[in-house]
Swiss-Prot record:
CDD domains: LGIC_ECD_GABAAR_LCCH3-like, LGIC_TM_anion. Residues 334-475 are cytoplasmic. Residues 24-251 are extracellular. Keywords: Cell membrane, Chloride, Chloride channel, Disulfide bond, Glycoprotein, Ion channel, Ion transport, Ligand-gated ion channel, Membrane, Postsynaptic cell membrane, Receptor, Signal, Synapse, Transmembrane, Transmembrane helix, Transport. It comes from Lymnaea stagnalis (Great pond snail). Disulfide bonds join C167-C181. This is Gamma-aminobutyric acid receptor subunit beta. Residues 1-23 form the signal peptide. It is found in: Postsynaptic cell membrane; Cell membrane. Pfam families: Neur_chan_LBD (PF02931), Neur_chan_memb (PF02932). Generally pentameric. There are five types of GABA(A) receptor chains: alpha, beta, gamma, delta, and rho. The keyword Cell cycle does not apply. One of its GO terms (molecular function) is GABA-A receptor activity.
Amino acid sequence: MWGIIVPFFSASLMCSLVAVVRCQQDTDHFANVTNTIDSLLKGYDIRLRPSFGGAPLEIGIEVILASFDSISEVDMDYTITMYLNQYWRDERLQFIFNESLDLGENRSVTTMTLTGAFAEKIWVPDTFLANDKNSFLHDITEKNKMVRLYGNGSLVYGMRFTTTLACMMDLHNYPLDHQECTVEIESYGYTMDDIVLYWLNDRGAVTGVEDVSLPQFSITNYATINKIEELSTGDYQRLSLIFQLQRNIGYFIFQTYLPSILIVMLSWVSFWINHEATSARVALGITTVLTMTTISNGVRSSLPRISYVKAIDIYLVMCFVFVFAALLEYAAVNYTYWGARAKRKAKRLRERATSVRKRVDDGDQMNNTNMDTVELKEVHMVPTSVGVTNSQSFNLDLDDGSGDDTGFRVVPPIPRSFTHSHATTHGYIPTNVVRRRSSSHVPPRRRRLLSHFRQKAKSIKVKIPRVQDVNTIDKYARLMFPLLFIIFNTSYWSVYLLT
């Protein structure tokens, strides 16, 4: 019995002793680490950079792209979320653990990962983004900052933040354009005499680019560049990360180009509508013009107010010209059709008036009476209390069958003996009698000038061929408008897609 109990209690006691020893060892370990950190910071001057007064401090830069959030053409900037890691060495932070800190299993403490609060107690680079507009450090659930300290004094200082960076875009070929946006990393206060920045592993210093995507752009390539900024305060090392972006055209095809093409084609429908259907053709033309105006305003609202012409401006303006030309085409058809009828009607009226005037003149010569020629205008006679018994008037109907009143009235000649005083005495007051003036009153010099200008005008007058059938204009328009639009599209897409 005792042979079983004694060994059991002995084993239990040994386990308890081992646990106590290990717990004491862990306590000593934590105390040693704390003492080591405290000893590192004791007498540490945060104001001085490592190797102060000696060679420039080399700081390696590493960028991990987390997301490419947005690009704004209006504000000329873009927003990204990234991890920025900085590597340097500070001999003042070297540490050596005691042998008692060996944790067994071939593991020993050679690094310490500390929170971002430790960065406020040591010297860190004053790195900033030269083209930054607005940035913020993520703090969920804690500030996204860390410091990793190695035994030889090497440090890794990392942080995660979102930044909006300026990107000056060239929109001449918009939306068939390529853009280059950069991340400019530089020391704010330390010149190259104190700090030298470099990309860690050159191109390998940037990762995560292949994993991000944008709705309107594709990242075709990226590059890292080292350059020197010469300012009045000194020469500064600057690291540039360049993103080469190509805009995706699919959105603009369905949002702008395809609707514009359909609107232009819709304006051609008026060429197949009867030219006498004025309301239909005018309404269709005005609707297409207003629709193109709406599309143009929508495109301009998403772009900055720049002075130069963009590729999409050229396309929209040409589409507007095509729909406006279709409306003007109907104006030409309508004027040709109704204007020709009006001219023929006026010509017939003039011929009839000339005929009547000739018959009246012939009748006067046969009667051999001295009369004044009265203009063929309506003469209003104001009757008084005393009338003339022999007064007669008659109307000549010059209607050509169209239902329009010509407005001509022929009044019989007035004898010379019927003077103004005699007419007033007998109650007749002619109110609108216009006597013909002889052209001899015009000075000879003016007549010569007028004759000279008439001859010049005839010599430079452009002869427009008469269109006998207005449908001919529509027939030519049905062919020429689509042909010209196809030529324009072929030239447009060839130029901008190749460039």
